[in-house]
Amino acid sequence: MNAHALGILEFSRLLAHVAGRATSAPGAAAVRALTPRTDREWIEAEHARVRAVRALVASELGWPTEPIPDIGEPLRRLRIEGLSWTALELLQGATLLRSSRRTRATLRDPRRPAIMLAYLVRYAEALVDLEPREQAIERAIGDDGTVRDDASPTLRKVRRDLRETEGQLVRLLEREMGKLEAHHQVSDLSVTMRNGRWVMPMRREARGYVGGIVHDSSGTGATIYVEPPAAVEFGNRVRELEIEEQREVERVLRALTDEIRPYHDAIGGAYDALVALDSLYARARYAIEAQCAPVTFGEPSAGFRIVDGRHPLLLASGGAVVPFDLTLHAGERTMLVSGPNTGGKTVLLKAIGLISMMAQCGVPAPLGETSQLAVFDDLYADVGDEQSIEASLSTFSAHLKNLGEILRSATTSSLVLIDELGSGTDPAEGAALGGAILETLTRRGTLTLATTHLGQLKLLATDVEGVVNASLQFDAVQLAPTYRLLKGVPGRSYGLSIARRLQIDEAVIQRAEERLPSGERDMAVLLADVEAREALLADRERLMEIDQEKLRARLATVGDRELKVREREREAERSARQEARRFLLEARGQVERAIADVKRQAQVEGEAFEETARAARRSIEEAAAEQGEAVAYVGLRGERDRARVDAKRGAAAAAANPSLGRTLRPERGAVAPLGEGDHVIVSTLDGKQGRIVSVRGQDARVAVGSLTVTVPLRTLTRSAAAPVSMYRTPILGDVPEVEPVREVDVRGLRVDEVDDQVLQALDAAVRNDLRELRIIHGKGTGALRSRVSEMLKKDTRVTGFRLGAWNEGGAGVTVAELA
């Protein structure tokens, strides 16, 4: 990538800002070393990796920030046999191994999203776990980087001897100092070490009295440091022990280095992976801080779309940054931006260049959602004043040199940024030259952004296909830039307006306006009108956005309320169904107990009893069918529930007492048969009156108030008069018909979904006089089997239950035995 253009954009400064978010010096260096790439596949993959790290940083578990020592050079030396690491380098190596092990474990934590870790698998696989080697180093080397005494038995003994010998030597020197005359002693000095030997200080004039070896003297020469003859032997012994200690330390370091040398490739790979992860972490943190949205990438021929773009360096400075939107479509190759000075044109060019280049480095750019960038093969920039006295280049010559390089090198996949095109020379010639350059680049297909003050260049968009005008909005009242980019509208320079604002003599301003060519004046009026209309449309757009936001908020509120209403309806329905289920279970229990009592008391044949029991059960099921969904009307339910209980009790009593049910004889003495439509008294319902709906054999369906029950004919007596009309509660919905089945399969259901299925199957089985019901629940965890067992224990219609035999499904099936 063009280093000259990157320098103009201050790209290294931007990378240094991002690198400041790394946790280690190697990681920061890796960020600073990033260069724009042209491989679209790599760029997209690198951004995906940054997004993965960003997601992990924002997750509950966070990101593992382990220390990464800078041991690139020691790692290169590790490959060479015979070379050893120093104690400090070994300690740094242990730190690296520990960071590798911990980061490896963190990235493989099953609690982390697998989809995110998939982008980082190449780094996770490169990390190593060499804990034994790590611990061996930490046992031998202390935190201060020195080899511990217990690194080896020999070292422990040598250092013990050294300490003892040095102690003896110091005591000897102190005794020798005590023998000196008072005027030969140096009162404020004591035994010390000079040039690796233990010595005692004394006055120079005492030299002839003591003898020995002088190892040093003070700056004035008045004090000398002497090793007396009596201390020489001890000093030699200390030196021998120091040499022996150093030899043993080197042996320990060599042994530790040799232990990790076979793993130099793995350790180097782990180091590179940790550095790469730290680089990704720095970029992810920058993306979070700068609120960078994910972007897509395309070919330069398709143009690009920048949404809420912000200048990265201005953003880094912490000041207020006005975002901009910019779209260049496939057929638009050149954008010519015009407007007054200090309007932000140069800042816009640099922002586009920086955004494109940082994205091609794998660094998220400060953009909004739906942005799409192009992948350029190179960047060319002619921005700023590059005059050079040494090179004898004027400003105009420097511009021409850069423009010549651009014309020679730029391709259809390049990005070209040109600031103040046509400036530095005669405006007419500058406009002609600038127009020719832009026309050449446009016809070549090079994506170009240029700024200018020359009015003639603004007309280029009408002559050359692919050239579009743009301007940075300027407040004509305040004479201050708004930095809002307007595509399709050329900008005015506002030179005379600014001069008037700065109180240049009005007569001068008026004369200047008179001297303007008529075409220029007409163009200025036209642009002013366009700007006013644009401002009006912008205001209306803002008002519409406010209204739309209010509408969205209102719709969201309505949606929330609707959800709450639906939830309340579902809760009411659940409560009603639970109440209905409880009521039916109680009713079934009462009837079954009544049948059991009758069976014990009645002296009837078994078959006759079974017939009456079946009739009683049918009455219960039909009463349940009439109930349906009406249980949702909780306020009207109480009276009806009591009537149903009475009906069930009456049916059971009728089944047990066949003497009931003879109809009253009319006065003539003939027996009048009961039929459909007759009004009757139901003896089993405490004499309540009803109307026969239908007759089937020895049973009749009778409408009693809001209920319809099935009772034996013998329990009915003709009523002399029609019953008093009763308020009939509307019944909404019906209990669905349940087909008789010998087995029900509840596999795949949740535990709280089993009840309805099993109860419906039991109802159908009892209604059709089945003796067994197979409930298939599967083996699994046993939760469904336990729930089925609990239900069967509580249901009085079930006389017993067992697990299935080997040919019935085994432990995956429960067989319920019915009365």
Curated annotation (Swiss-Prot):
Protein name: Endonuclease MutS2
GO molecular function term, any single one: ribosomal large subunit binding
Record EC number: 3.1.-.-, 3.6.4.-
HAMAP family noted in UniProt: MutS2 (MF_00092)
Origin superkingdom: Bacteria
Its biological purpose: Endonuclease that is involved in the suppression of homologous recombination and thus may have a key role in the control of bacterial genetic diversity. Acts as a ribosome collision sensor, splitting the ribosome into its 2 subunits. Detects stalled/collided 70S ribosomes which it binds and splits by an ATP-hydrolysis driven conformational change. Acts upstream of the ribosome quality control system (RQC), a ribosome-associated complex that mediates the extraction of incompletely synthesized nascent chains from stalled ribosomes and their subsequent degradation. Probably generates substrates for RQC.
InterPro entries assigned: DNA_mismatch_repair_MutS_C (IPR000432), DNA_mismatch_repair_MutS_core (IPR007696), DNA_mismatch_repair_MutS_sf (IPR036187), MSSS (IPR046893), MutS (IPR045076), MutS2 (IPR005747), P-loop_NTPase (IPR027417), Smr_dom (IPR002625)
Family recorded in the similarity comment: Belongs to the DNA mismatch repair MutS family. MutS2 subfamily.
Domain Smr: from-to ranges: 744-819
Species this chain originates from: Gemmatimonas aurantiaca (strain DSM 14586 / JCM 11422 / NBRC 100505 / T-27)
Quaternary structure annotation from Swiss-Prot or TrEMBL: Homodimer. Binds to stalled ribosomes, contacting rRNA.
GO biological process terms on file: mismatch repair; negative regulation of DNA recombination; rescue of stalled ribosome
UniProt keyword terms in alphabetical order: ATP-binding, DNA-binding, Endonuclease, Hydrolase, Nuclease, Nucleotide-binding, RNA-binding, rRNA-binding
Binding site residues for ATP: G339, P340, N341, T342, G343, G344, K345, T346
